[in-house]
Design a protein with these regions (language model features):
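Extended boundary segments
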Residues: 1-22
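Acidic/glycine-rich C-terminal interaction modules and beta/coil loop segments
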Residues: 26-132
Length: 132
């Protein structure tokens, strides 16, 4: 099945919004669980509007990996990174044990798009790793 994810400002991604497309087995990476259609230009020149990105489901990524994310109800394809939160935001990134957590950052390859700093106050999840 294919779902659209934004390579831009965000696209709704849910399990009820899909189509089935046939591909030769050789076109699909072995570990792919599903494919999503890229929508937009923020990941150019690597990922293009309309291209299928093949996804391995996972809930964690390392900085520098490209993934599919749900953030505030929208789906994104971006490069994952982490940074120490700004001083003003540290309270929101500190758990009840006093441990300071890193802030997730979603980065576009196309430099006309600013990095998206993930707020701990908004729903965020890693859906999977892009394999192609």
């Amino acid at each position: 099945s294919t779902l659209s994810v934004s390579a831009g400002t965000g696209t709704f991604l849910d399990e009820g919004n899909f189509e089935t497309i046939s591909f030769p087995k050789s076109a699909v990476p072995d570990r792919a669980d599903f494919g999503v259609r890229v929508c937009g230009d923020s990941m150019e020149p690597v990922y293009h509007d309309g291209q299928i990105a093949w996804i391995q489901e996972c809930s964690e990524l390392s900085p520098g990996e490209v993934g599919i994310f749900m953030y505030d109800g929208d789906g994104y394809i971006k490069m994952y990174d982490e940074q120490e939160p700004r001083e003003a935001d540290r309270y929101d990134f500190t758990d009840s044990d006093g441990t300071l957590h890193m802030q997730s950052v979603l980065i576009s390859y196309n430099k006309k798009y600013e990095p998206k700093l993930v707020s701990p106050l908004v729903r965020f999840s890693i859906v999977g790793r892009v394999l192609n």
